[in-house]
From Swiss-Prot:
Induction: Up-regulated in thyroid carcinoma cells. InterPro entries: PA28_C, PA28_C_sf, PA28_N_sf, Proteasome_activ_PA28, Proteasome_activ_PA28_N, Proteasome_activ_sf. The gene is PSME3. GO terms for biological process: apoptotic process; negative regulation of extrinsic apoptotic signaling pathway; regulation of G1/S transition of mitotic cell cycle; regulation of proteasomal protein catabolic process. This is Proteasome activator complex subunit 3. It comes from Homo sapiens (Human).
């Protein structure tokens, strides 16, 4: 096979070194890292911050007081009301040029700090799972032998393992999208409250979204733990077929 394709020996040595490094790292991940991480996440799920039953405890102050109602009075001193108001408003607009913005009486509108704290702990865990799955997936792909007739049952197990790892990667990436959507949706609602401070439904919707996100974050952590459990169990049960899909595997590997 080597005679069919000329390969630079120096490059070949570097590629072989890369394969050995991936193999060593992936086997350590499956044997040691996955079980340790699932226990760590299981412990995280038992922390008080993730076991709040009264969800009103995670509500945050909107920092947007309801303004006093505007009282309209009759015009006096012979001034025509609408015309006089329009002239005064025109004078103000001429004095202050630029983009119109809503003035927040109490400063910046902050996020729900309790949820932000949880999110900042969850995001690194999501990224870590994606990275580790990618390493293990590469390892299994490198173990797949060349295509040929015969008993390919072991190869099908390898392919199913790769597919499962790819699915876990995609699901983990979707968790990051979910977090981004939460921030965007909440920001739009808070902007609505700033514009329509007297509408109570907007304020209630923000608290509903915060409660929903809290439940979702706990579910994400639970799913991360379960994915480590599933991958560890699946690979260990099929490790023989994954590493040696065919009896002549040593001769048929690329």
């Amino acid at each position: 096979m080597a005679s069919l394709l000329k390969v630079d020996q120096e490059v070949k040595l570097k590629v072989d070194s890369f394969r050995e490094r991936i193999t060593s790292e992936a086997e350590d991940l499956v044997a040691n890292f996955f079980p340790k991480k699932l226990l760590e996440l299981d412990s995280f799920l038992k922390e008080p911050i993730l076991n709040i039953h009264d969800l009103t405890q995670i509500h945050s102050d909107m920092n947007l007081p309801v303004p006093d109602p505007i009282l309209l009075t009759n015009s006096h001193d012979g001034l025509d009301g609408p015309t006089y108001k329009k002239r005064r408003l025109d004078e103000c607009e001429e004095a202050f040029q630029g983009t119109k913005v809503f003035v927040m009486p109490n400063g910046m509108l902050k996020s729900n700090q309790q949820l932000v704290d949880i999110i900042e702990k969850v995001k690194p865990e999501i990224r870590l799972l994606i990275e580790k799955c990618n390493t293990v997936k590469m390892w299994v792909q490198l173990l797949i032998p060349r295509i040929e007739d015969g008993n390919n049952f072991g190869v099908s197990i390898q392919e199913e393992t790769v597919a499962e790892l790819r699915t876990v990667e995609s699901e983990a990436a979707s968790y990051l999208d979910q977090i981004s959507r939460y921030y965007i949706t909440r920001a739009k609602l808070v902007s609505k409250i700033a514009k329509y401070p007297h509408v109570e439904d907007y304020r209630r919707t923000v608290t509903e979204i915060d409660e929903k996100e809290y439940i979702s974050l706990r579910l994400i952590i639970s799913e991360l733990r379960n994915q480590y459990v599933t991958l560890h169990d699946m690979i260990l049960k099929n490790i023989e077929k994954i590493k040696r899909p065919r009896s002549s595997n040593a001769e048929t590997l690329y």
